[in-house]
Amino acid sequence: MMQVLLVTICLAVFPYHGSSIILESGNVNDYEVVYPQKVTAMPKEAVKQPEQKYEDAMQYKFEVNGEPVLLHLEKNKDLFSEDYSETHYSPDGREITTKPLVQDHCYYHGHIQNDAHSSASISACNGLKGHFKLRGEMYLIEPLKLSDSEAHAVYKYENVEKEDEALKMCGVTQTNWESDEPIKKASLLVATSERNRYFNPYSYVELIITVDHSMVTKYKNDLTAIRTWVFELVNTINEIFKYLYIRVPLVGLEIWKNRDLINVTSAANVTLDLFGEWRKSYLLPRKIHDNSQLLTAIDLNGLTIGMAYVSTMCQSKYSVGVVQDHSKINLRVAVTMAHEIGHNLGLTHDGVYCTCGGYSCIMSAVLGDQPSKYFSNCSYNQYRRFLTEHNPECIINPPLRTDIVSPPACGNELLERGEECDCGSPENCRDPCCDAASCKLHSWVECESGKCCNQCRFKRAGTECRPARDECDKAEQCTGRSANCPVDEFHENGRPCLHNFGYCYNGKCPIMYHQCHALFGQNVTGVQDSCFQYNRLGVYYAYCRKENGRKIPCAPKDEKCGRLYCSYKSPGNQIPCLPYYIPSDENKGMVDHGTKCGDGKVCSNGQCVDLNIAY
C-alpha cells in the first residue's frame, strides 16, 4: 500500500489586504497576503519514503477573506508517461533528446474541505502557485517575490486587470452537422459493452507539446521557465478533462530552440496544416503519441487564439492543434489548449442549448472573461458519439505509468514493474495469453488485445478492421504484423463525392443540404442560389468573414461561402431564404469549410477558391 505523508500549513501571522500590485499574472487590484508555515503531522502508519522529495498528498490551511480553508492536494500521477522525453535542436539541426526524471514532481490537484464544488490545480515546486475554486469563485495564488520568502498573494480571478479588451476566439468555423438541442437523459444511460470499453477505465490522450522559437524568444531562452509553464498547462488540462474521464499524460516536449522547423505564421490555418504535415512526417515516426499541440507566441490573425481539426484524434496528420500563448494567466492558455484538444475529440462550439451550470463552457467559441473549466451537456454527448462512431483506438491504451513503486506481486491482478500480464491466481485466470504462475505471456503469444488480435495471435493480413464510414473514408486492413488497426486514413481532399454534389474534406463530404438539415431538421429543401446575394451586404448576419471585428461583405464570386441559407417548409409556413444566426455564436451557420461552391471550387476561409488552391 502506498504510504502517504500529510502536511498541514497554518498561518504564522495574520493575513493582510493590499490594494494594487504587479504579479506574474498581471496587475492585480485587490489581493490578500498570507504567510504559510509548514507543520508536519505524521500518522503512525505513514512513513515518508527517503528518496521522495514531494509528498503524494498534502493539506494546506490558510484564510481567504477571513474564512479558514483547508486545501487538500493529491499528486497528479497521470501528468507524465514513464517514457517522457524532451527534445531540442542544436544550431546545425541535430536532435538532442533527454529523458529527465519526472516521477517525483510537484504538480497537484485538489479540493477545499466542506465545499463539494471546489477544485484546485497547484504547483508546489517553489511555494504554492496555481488556482482554486472556492464557493463558486476562482482564486489565484502565487508566492510573492519578497525578502520574506513565505509571503503568498491570494486574489480573485476577477481582480486581475484585463490585458486588453479584444475578444479572444477559436478559429474553427466548421460545424459537424449535429444539432446542439438537448438530448434526453435516458439516451445517456444506454451503453453497450463496446461503449463501456471506452468509458471505463479512463481514456488516455498521450500528448506532445511543441514549443516554437517565438516562445523561446518570449521566455528569454529560459528553457526551465518554458518547462514550468508547460507542466502547469498540462496539469490544468488534466483537471479539465477528468470530467470526461480522459487523462492527458505528457509524453514529450519539443522545443524549437534555435529556429522553427516549419514556417509559423499568423495565419492559423496555414500554420495548422504545416504543423500537421511535420507531425506526420517527422514527429510521429520518432515518438509514439496520440496528439500534438503547437504552442506559439506569435499573434494569430484577427481575434484567433487557437485552431484545430475536428474529430481527428488518432489521425497521423490531423490530430493536432495550434494555440497562442496569449495570456500571463496560465489558466487561460490551458483552457484554450483544452478547447482545441476538444475539437480533435469531436467537440464543436457550444450553441444556445448548451450549458454547464451557469458558467461559460470550455467549447464556447469565445474565451470568457472568467474562463470555465467545465464541458457543456452538448460536449458530453458529442464526445460519446465520437467514441462510438470513430472508434479512436489510440486513446484506449494507457501509457506507461510512473506511480507504482511497491514491489510487484504476481497474482494480484495489477500490472506492475517486471510483469507482462497479471490475470490473478492460476485458478481464477481467464486470460489465454497469460501464464498465471509467472505473470509472463506464453512464448507463442503475438498479442493480447486489439482489433487485429484474435486468440493471442495477429489476424491475417488483409482482414478488414475498420470499415469505411462513407465514400470519403478509407477502410483499414490488418497488416498481419500488429494487433492494432492502422491509423484511420481518408481519401484525399477534393475527391468528388455524393454524385458530384460535393468534394471530400477530411474524410467527410460537406454539402449545404446536410448542413441545413443539421441546423433546422427535416423540413428543409434545396436552397435557391439567389438567397446568397444577401451575403454581399456585409450586415450583422450576412457577410463572408471578419477582419479585426469588421464584417467583410462577400464578393459576388464568394457569396456561397458566407452565411448559409436554407429553404424551410412546414405546414402553413414556407421560408425560401432562412439564415441560421445566433448573436452569441456568429460562426455557427456559416457555410462549412470545404463545401462545394462551384465546379472545381470549394469554400476556404470565406472565399470560393479552386481545389488546387484550397488543398
UniProtKB/Swiss-Prot annotation:
Signal peptide, first to last residue: 1-20
Cofactor(s) needed: Zn(2+)
Binding site for Ca(2+) 1: 206, 290, 394, 397
Residues reported in the UniProt entry to bind Zn(2+): 339, 343, 349
Example of a GO biological process term: proteolysis
Coiled coil regions in record: none
Protein name as it appears in the record: Zinc metalloproteinase-disintegrin-like daborhagin-K
